[in-house]
């Protein structure tokens, strides 16, 4: 779940296990998130947060997804600057006072590869202002891009949010195909194992952090 108010973003996620045997996996990501948040304060290396997530996951019998990460958040930038890893591998950067971060452990079973891969299904899209050369677009394409930039200001969106723009559906598909509109693929665990996610957005201070989601 994401919220954007005048460009200020909060990002959060929960996993609900519909199958009872998957509840331990869902709970493990919640515990890993809680332990990571306890360690978040100005000056802490981001690699330390990743190590905490990994050690917590392993202690509970699960494995973190190594190629999914948390991230810094800035105004109108959901993924900005610093990366918050979910494993203990070297990763540059330290948490900065006053900065906003989304920390989000993704976990899978020990049978999993510990990484996700892309599928062909794409349901989330984004137009990055300033990177689309409007003068190279035809009239309806240019109009659609301008509408998307004005409405979402570079933030991700899904098709159900633009049902009022159905007359542009064909142009949208064409702009996705030629790369002027970026499309995010649906991700799955490489070996087909289940994945859980827990996420909060925090503001980092000198002596800790405040959860705002």
Place the predicted regions along the sequence by residue.
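Active-site neighborhoods and metal-handling regions in enzymes and metal-associated proteins
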Residues: 1-213
